[in-house]
């Protein structure tokens, strides 16, 4: 990630129309992998995650002039990625016929995914995470996989730190219960 000095340079370059393309390319280079994994922890397939990363950066590019720099670039990108991902998940949930078929699809997708390299325990763990409500899953993924601080998550999601801690704690308990029940 960019440090504050680099971020200030990038922000200045974004304001200059002759440097904007290069500055945005730097942003994509710095953040695309983190945004991909953030999204990938929310959606099942590599292709969907890639599409959502592209949608995130397209939306960022289209709105770059409205970015005032009140927050870090990464915070702004995560917010866009979250909105794009949640919209995708809502659309998918409307199209999903049954929960049983979704769980079957999840198992099939993750086991056949060339980008997934986990064992049976990891598959069970991912299945347990997938049962969490979207917002809880989002908080869990940001804290557990991305090792974000509650302050960062709070800024991105616009939720109090106390609520985030409670959500994470409940998510952990649900995951533990699901894993214990499968033994």
Task: Describe these PLM feature segments.
Residues 139-143:
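A short pre-motif secondary-structure segment
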Residues 66-68, 79-99, 170:
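Arg/Lys-rich amphipathic alpha helix in sigma70-family domain 2
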Residues 3-9, 95-118:
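Internal acidic/polar
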Residues 26-46, 63, 129, 178-181:
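Amphipathic, Lys/Arg- and hydrophobic-enriched alpha-helical face
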Residues 75, 86, 136, 155-182:
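DNA-recognition helix of helix-turn-helix
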